[in-house]
Amino acid sequence: MILPQAIKPVVTHLSHQDRLLAFYKWVGIPLRSKATVLLVHGLGEHIGRYTHVAHYLQAAGYAVFGYDNHGHGMSSGEKGSLIADNQLVDDLRFVIEHVRRQTAGPLVLVGHSMGGLIAAEAAVQNKQGIDLLVMSSPALGADTNPVQKLLLFMLPSLLPNVRVDNGVRSQWLARDERVVKEYENDHLVHRKISVRLASWILRTGEKVVREAE
């Protein structure tokens, strides 16, 4: 397979309610694509890090789009914050509708880590508009002890917007040192997570697993 040259995506901002979402459209989208792929990124990163994935999919005949979640990348909001429980899923639904107006044929959601959780919860709530769901290491289970879990259920009502280190370590992401360095030097990457977002990830991960069964 011959991959296209590394061309940066065209980035615009979509206005949704009181927030702006950075929307990515990779150029060279096939006129007659096999399907449309919408990429959803993980905690602390941004969708621009998936350009190599977009180029690979384009070469295989897929149209590719993506966006930065609220509080991530070039989208609005404090880094790692969450306004309301269903906000991230609501944003994804808004982007799906925007993509659907531009394309025809099947829509494939590809979500990594927190993005996999957002995509899975969207599918559990309403499969309409989603033809296929692909998850990479989805955040469906957190390694927490009973005390930590209790705190994450209680603290959002007391200190919802307090932000702490998100615990993501660059050395976990790849064996390729070049990839690790790029991540560490990326000014759009952050290492913050609010109490409300951490609680939502924990609760929603358990909910998705329970309801998917």
Residue ranges and their predicted role:
Residues 145-185:
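Helix-rich cap/lid subdomain of alpha/beta-hydrolase
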Residues 1-28:
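N-terminal cap/lid segment of alpha/beta-hydrolase-fold proteins
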Residues 106-107, 113-133, 140-141:
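Conserved hydrolase catalytic core segment
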Residues 171-213:
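Serine-hydrolase catalytic core
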Residues 33-42:
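Short beta-strand element of the alpha/beta-hydrolase
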Residues 44-46, 73-103:
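Catalytic nucleophile-loop/oxyanion-hole region of alpha/beta-hydrolase
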Residues 49, 54-78:
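Conserved alpha/beta-hydrolase
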